[in-house]
Amino acid sequence: MLQDSFSYTVEQFADLQILRYRVPGFENLPLRRKQLIYYLSQAALEGRDILFDQNGKYNLQIRRLLEAVYIHFKGDRTSEQFFALEVYLKRVWFANGIHHHYACDKFVPAFTSDYLEEVVNSLPEEVLPLEEGETCQAMCDKLFPVIFDPSVMPKRVNQSDGEDLVLTSAANYYEGVTQQEAEAFYAAQKKADDQEPVMYGMNSRLVKENGHVYEQVWKVGGMYSSAIEKIISWLQKAEDVAENDAQREVIRLLIEFYRTGDLKLFDAYSIAWLKDTDSLVDFVNGFIESYGDPLGMKASWESIVNFKDMEATHRTETISSNAQWFEDHSPVDARFKKTEVKGVSAKVITAAILAGDLYPSTAIGINLPNSNWIRSVHGSKSVTIGNLTDAYNKAARGNGFREEFVYSETERQLLEKYADITDDLHTDLHECLGHGSGKLLPGVDPDALKAHGSTIEEARADLFGLYYLPDAKMIELGLVPDAEAYKAEYYSYMMNGLMTQLVRIEPGCTVEEAHMRNRQLIARWALEHGQAEHVVEMVNRDGKTYVRINDYAKLRMLFGKLLAEIQRIKSEGDYEAARQLVETYAVQVDPVLHAEVLQRYRSLHLAPYKGFVNPVYTPQTDAEGNITDVHISYSEGYAEQMLRYSRDYSNL
């Protein structure tokens, strides 16, 4: 399929645009690697229901109810009410639940409860997702308040200072326990002198029954067993066609972890995965990121299957091989620097399938594992996902965004000339170096920053990248074409952090998501601290607000200063300073500027959030059932894919 004729956009609704991505190079892989990718992609798809359930305990039944309506309703499918229901279902698919994937607020249906009740009652009972012994009426009585009452489960993850974050979050990680009880439960498990602590609570739901607090572990024979068993069956097939012994061991340890739920085994798996840098095909499958837990402990299920982009990997390897130089020259207090940077193995990858918390909305860079001690002893693995970045860039060409928000032609030309390069490079620096830099002082709890941990960690990685982009070392290593290139990233970062990312927030709301908080924190802090010298200004022209950078070199010094402070906060576990920074700069929104940005954005008819449909892999078999080839196709639509996944991979 030729690049120019490839259609990157699928459809657009609500605040979402659905794209598709190409998997260049798949057709040319040898059969064994195609088989490996196919088996791993099946293992990825089998876990879909886990995330729906983690995001809220009624999500699966609500999704299935709406799907039943969407498939079987025989009445007027052209009415406004039906259209509203269709959009709502598409949003639920996208968010893996009834709360916004990014802002975490519950969706407000544009159809009425009377309409849904009428439609549901028109369906034959056998197509409804009734639980054992449940009547249609009982199901509606249970689910309708969850869908329609704004006071019921309003937020998936609540980060509001001073509230019980566990009781006020709708995510399904805790049942019947308060924040205090949850924190006490895990504090009692932690040993102060443990040099190799497991990630407590990572793979379980914490429940209180009859005054007894205990964990329901996600494993074979435990919670989510039926989905995990399916995942294992495909992983076993993958093990048979693994590229080498190291990869075989990775898969074996992962299967063992899924069977036992033993977190020591998860650490062993993480270390083995980290050390396998030779395999072309790689994958993540499991409970990984903790953004969905207000306490930052419990990990959502995700999977990605990928293979190395050899050409682009040269860039990240250059950065990684110089990691010690960057650590030594960072503007951070020597007490907080790593004396010896453990190799961050870095590569650019081509995604072959996305699943769980990486689907449809996904990351463009990943740095794992998340265990602090493993990172400091064994290093980490960092990836930039080349074909997804490429799809975003191709889909956004000529959409009018820069013309509307960028201050002048000078900045527009900077962005036109350098943005694709500096954007990728900032992601690489963030993932390869940023997360891997610095160290905690002895005895500091990695969870000391509590609810602000994610924001501070993302800011630390972003600042590391921002600080180094203008460095002469970048030109010396051949990573940027000239000394002007970094200005493109500085401009787009400040414009985004101060203004344009606000398009992702509803009027009257505050900034909640960790990555958005980090970007606003950095941009607002720099704006304020450079005020006296007019380093960066918000200027008004023809009634519109723009960001203008007057002194790029001084802006770099400000980034360095903030990096030093944020590293100190992380290294010392200074919760109060973290809270101050976040509450002062990262959370509040100027309502007047917000309204203006939303108005200007609306006129462009763009969607602030983007996600992907996956390609479809079809195995070709001989008479004996052996796979002889795997074909890839890109023609599946959004609803078509979601309904197929619900039909073929509904395991809970």
Positions of PLM-derived features:
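Short alpha-helix carrying the canonical HExxH Zn2+-binding catalytic motif
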Residues: D420-L433
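Extended, compositionally biased alpha-helical segments that mediate assembly or anchoring
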Residues: D551, L555-L652
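N-terminal-proximal low-complexity accessory segments that begin disordered
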Residues: L2-I71
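Short, glycine/acidic-rich hinge or "gate" loops at secondary-structure transitions
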Residues: D245-I251, F266-A268, V444-D447, M474-Y491, ...
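Long, well-structured alpha-helical subdomains associated
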Residues: R22, L51, L466-I569
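An active-site-proximal "capping" alpha-helix that borders the catalytic cofactor pocket
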Residues: P30, N244, S454-D471
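Contiguous, non-catalytic segments that form substrate-binding/exosite surfaces or channel walls
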Residues: V87, F94-Q413, A419
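Post-HEXXH active-site segment of zinc metalloproteases
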Residues: G438-A459
